[in-house]
Amino acid sequence: MALNKRELFQKRRLRVRNKLRKISDGRPRLSVHRSSKNISVQVIDDVKGVTLAAASSLEKDLGVVGKNNVEAAAKIGAAIAERAKKAGVEEVIFDRGGFLFHGKIKALADAAREGGLKF
């Protein structure tokens, strides 16, 4: 039986999340969500259950033109790296969810690494 697009996404998401649980070691999680119009990212401390930092293409002060493209993802990645460092976070685990590590997700991850986050 062939799986549809949504089922493949859910299968990937569960596989990624289970791998992250095994290697987390108490490090915060850099969680990415991409919709058809926007991109958002959070640094989440799963031990305490709190969000330490967040950035989104919906924020006016980031100056994102075209809210869901590679350039916007790079700006959001740089912003989350800066905000995470202010919150005292330098090392995270990258949680791409069910999204492929390609295009916008890759641009966001590369910009966050250049901003000083280690993962």
Swiss-Prot record:
Coiled-coil parts of chain: none
CC terms in the record's Gene Ontology section: cytosolic large ribosomal subunit
Keyword flag rRNA-binding: yes
InterPro entries: Ribosomal_uL18_bac-type, Ribosomal_uL18_bac/euk
Keyword Ribonucleoprotein: yes
GO terms for MF: 5S rRNA binding; structural constituent of ribosome
Role noted for this protein: This is one of the proteins that bind and probably mediate the attachment of the 5S RNA into the large ribosomal subunit, where it forms part of the central protuberance.
Family indicated by similarity: Belongs to the universal ribosomal protein uL18 family.
Protein name: Large ribosomal subunit protein uL18
Species of origin: Paracoccus denitrificans (strain Pd 1222)
Gene transcribed to yield this protein: rplR
